[in-house]
């Protein structure tokens, strides 16, 4: 196996916006898990919670590792700041971490190096808050018809979410494409879903000599 030099790192974790914070939290053995909030679930977590496994359409735990109080700064990229500010947090996290890794490596402002750099992004292709909202009108319409028939009232309406940006609908390749464009990376870029083994696949399948390896787990 060929040798790979790690020349830049960054990270964004629950309770840790930098690698230094992450390391200190590990040393101090901090438990940075917490209970889900309405912001995480889109509704009160109590609606979905049921104490006990096996209950249909319910979860038996709302505890997890949630990123809190992260503010994405959309400036300093090769794409419009207003456009980036409207992207799903999945994309914004990827942009932030990639930019910080480039800065840590010393190549953020090196245009030639970035043109010869690619990106391999590990991404679990689960629905995001934004992608769900794009389809909410379909769900609402279906439920609406059933409720109208059940109650015998054709005037009942169930509102859907406000329209989301269409770019937020694609979950597999779009994050890597957006990061590559925003940071002007000129070589091959792609995302793959291999859960915890994603980083191993990325190292094995790296398309260019200089590449990012990002693992994004939600």
Give the location of each predicted region.
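Conserved catalytic cysteine-centered active-site region
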Residues: 65-77, 89, 146-205
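Flexible, low-complexity linker/loop segments at domain and module junctions
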Residues: 1-7, 109-116, 213
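Carboxylate/His-rich catalytic cores and anion/metal-binding grooves
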Residues: 119-122, 127-153, 157, 161
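Beta-strand segments within the central parallel beta-sheet cores of soluble alpha/beta enzyme folds
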Residues: 111-121, 160-162, 189-194, 216-218
